[in-house]
Amino acid sequence: MDEEYDVIVLGTGLTECILSGIMSVNGKKVLHMDRNPYYGGESSSITPLEELYKRFQLLEGPPESMGRGRDWNVDLIPKFLMANGQLVKMLLYTEVTRYLDFKVVEGSFVYKGGKIYKVPSTETEALASNLMGMFEKRRFRKFLVFVANFDENDPKTFEGVDPQTTSMRDVYRKFDLGQDVIDFTGHALALYRTDDYLDQPCLETINRIKLYSESLARYGKSPYLYPLYGLGELPQGFARLSAIYGGTYMLNKPVDDIIMENGKVVGVKSEGEVARCKQLICDPSYIPDRVRKAGQVIRIICILSHPIKNTNDANSCQIIIPQNQVNRKSDIYVCMISYAHNVAAQGKYIAIASTTVETTDPEKEVEPALELLEPIDQKFVAISDLYEPIDDGCESQVFCSCSYDATTHFETTCNDIKDIYKRMAGTAFDFENMKRKQNDVFGEAEQ
């Protein structure tokens, strides 16, 4: 271990593993360490089921009705991949897809007035949806056509909207859309967690709705993908990429000290040895004095013996409860997967409800989601602090990732990865640099 590296990475969460893979592909000499004996850090999948019970101090362990413990892989952080999103691009460009198998998530639903409805995102679905009345449907259809045709480089498609200055609130007004439609457009299509976006320039929202529609168009049932055997497969896939390009991995390796000289990182001390480096990447747990708390997320893992009601017996789905529907500032999310994804015993389902904490009674905040899941066989409640770095790391060359937020997709994580890359390399992250061969997620060559 007494060696000189370009980059040392501490923690094997998804953000760290992707950056480690990218740096190795770029020819950097990388040492990657984790104090845990398993991959994934905060974003790991726990197996066997007995481990999950232990982790949550449920000492009696799982009952026999839960089946074989090793048939379970339970994600600690529930997220899906947008089929056309940034993480899928990273997987394709690096060919990490060869280590993973994906399934399309069967449905995307939105909550309104105590019931759940399928999210309409095409013209045909919008016209058939019970979410809106007839006239509302026509207006919404017009809006979707406008978004689909919108091209920020072609003013002819603007229809009087300025992408840089017109607010999204004004765009909704232009199409005369009602509050319910605005709710599900902003939260179930554009996937915002709060309503802060309404007064921002509309371009980002339009692009987010496009991403949703393009992701949906790709594979049909929903815009989301999920890997067989759980999300813990993702960091491991990028770790393999790093190893192929000469990266060194050490699990179960305690970190005693991060060594600084004149305010710059020069190495990491572990078990009496020092590995030297020019740059350091880590998650917040390795540098508590260089991060600040930015909020909390509650995640409740629920094991069920039945599909969720009114989802057409889907074996996987996402439900978004827009904040307006339950008098909150932040949305509540449910991600559900099952035995069909090799993450649970036969006939069992895992639904994870999560939201940004707003009160002193977080469990009560998630109640509207839990009501949709009844009866629940077993609950595991986790309340996590969210951390972010206090500086950009350019001076110290210590680059810290942000905690995983309450969103149910990886777009914010990818933004963090691109941001850290830019600060480390001094140039913007370019997917083209990582290109090995262009196939789609299911291994078929692109047309």
Curated annotation (Swiss-Prot):
It is found in: Cytoplasm; Golgi apparatus, trans-Golgi network. InterPro entries: FAD/NAD-bd_sf (IPR036188), GDP_dissociation_inhibitor (IPR018203), RabGDI (IPR000806). The keyword Signal does not apply. GO terms for cellular component: Golgi apparatus. Belongs to the Rab GDI family. Interacts with RHOH. Interacts with the non-phosphorylated forms of RAB1A, RAB3A, RAB5A, RAB5B, RAB5C, RAB8A, RAB8B, RAB10, RAB12, RAB35, and RAB43. This is Rab GDP dissociation inhibitor alpha. It comes from Pongo pygmaeus (Bornean orangutan). The lineage of its organism: Eukaryota, Metazoa, Chordata, Craniata, Vertebrata.
